[in-house]
Each structure stands twice: as C-alpha cells, then as structure tokens.
Amino acid sequence: AAFFIDSEIWPNMILNLKKKKIPIILINGRITHKSFIRWKFFENFSKKIFDNFNLCFSSNKETVNFLKKLGAKKILNVGNLKFSQTEKKSEKIQENLKKFFKSKKVWCASSTHFNEENLCGLVHKELKKKYTNLLTIIIPRHINRTPSIKKDLNKLGLKVHTQDLKSKIPDDTDIYIVNAYGKTKSFYNYCKSVFLGGSIINHGGQNPLEAARFGCKILHGPNVSNFKEIYTFLNQNKISSKITSPKMMSKILVKFFSKKSVSNKVKKKINNIGQKILNVTYKEVNLLLKNEI
C-alpha cells in the first residue's frame, strides 16, 4: 500500500499507483478551506485524483466535508494523529543559563514570525512594571531574522542578548533570543508559560501539543486554522488562551505565572486520545489490506 500524509497529495504518483493496482491511503488528512478552493477550481481533475483513494483518515470534521466534495469515497474521521506523538527527552539547558534563569521570572515566545516579536517586546515592557526580574525568551521560526529582531526590540528600548555559549549574559537583559535550531524542547522544559507564534499573523498557527506535553500553559493569536481541533481541546481543558492584543496577553501571563503547569491528568488525556486514534487507524488499515490482498 502507498500512504499519503496530511495534505501531501501528489496527483501523478496517485495515478501511477492506481494503474499498478496498489491501494492508496490518506493518513491524518487535512484540507484547509484555502486548499479546498484550489482543488475545487480544477473540479474534474480533483475528482479523478481523490476517487483513487481506497481509504481516507481525516484529522477533523471540516476535512471530511471537503474530501466528500472532492470525490473521496471511504472517509473516516478518527482525529488528529499529532495527539499520538511522544516527546523524546529534551536536551538540558547549560548550567550558566540555568543559573541565570533561576533568578528571573521567565516566559517564552516560540516559533515567532515577523511583527510577533514586537508584540512580545510590548508585553515585556508592560509586565516589567510588575516583575522587575522579568526575562522574555524568543525562539524565532526563522533564525536568519535574528539581527532584524534584535534591532526592532532595541528600538523599543529593550536590552537584547542573543544565544552565545561563551559570553556572559548581562543581568539587565530583557530579551534572550535563541538563534539556533533544535533547542525549543529544552526551553519548554524550563518555561511553563509559552506564546506560540504564526497565530497573530495569518499563518495558521503552530502545533501546540509539544508545549502542552511539557506542561506549558499556552497563549496564541486568533489565526490557528491549521490546528483548530487541537486548540479547541486545549481551550476546553484550560491549557491555552487566545489573545488579540499586548494588554490582553500581559493580563493572561500574570494569571499563568500564579498557576501550576499543566497537570499529569491532562497529559494522560492527550496520550489516551492519541492511542485511540492510532488503534482505529491500525485496525482499519489492516482490514483494508486483508481485503485487497
């Protein structure tokens, strides 16, 4: 069998696989409204492609509706497979950083995009009135933007330090920029209040489950269309909060600072949902393949 994942659908490959009578399965299918409009523009071609799927596992109800309209026949709404991911142990933060963080009130802005860092800078200035030892950690989505981020934050009158293992971090640092890839989990393990970027700008948001599994309380903007059902679950369990302004973000962060991190009960709930989705997926794939062979 051939498996296509998420929204990675390759028409030529699908047509060739069908000629060879190889079963085609869509796993964790996700069709956004934007991509549905694109597929719908070539309606006859789209139906020819989606009709070839022997089985489609949808990650949400919206995708079920779109898949039907695009010509897919057997569709199962099992939920988002991202619930089933497990987190490896995070790298440890260097001792000098750990020591520095211990004397600070720390929060983190992760996977930030253009303009979102400025919002975090304004939030920092507001919170600094209440927490004089505040430190804001920014992990940009694209680290090549670090110099321009630093410049913009300096214009707000903030003292910025970029990650450098050799140099000492000045005690009056306001913003610490992580300008290296693969370090996010280390900071989730340490910061329990996290803003996830790509959600103020119209990008569709970032997957929040990783942060939730590390026990973080999550802030996000209004644009989270890529992970709608996950954020609904997190909002219902009081793990995440939507923000629309620096003032609103500051208020919620004050609440987060006074609360405990996400409970083990909620983490277990996330894992149980993931296991159920995996079990249904395995069962249905095995049934299909038995019938096809």
Give names to the regions the model predicted:
Residues A1-I293:
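Nucleotide-activated sugar donor-binding and catalytic core shared by glycosyltransferases
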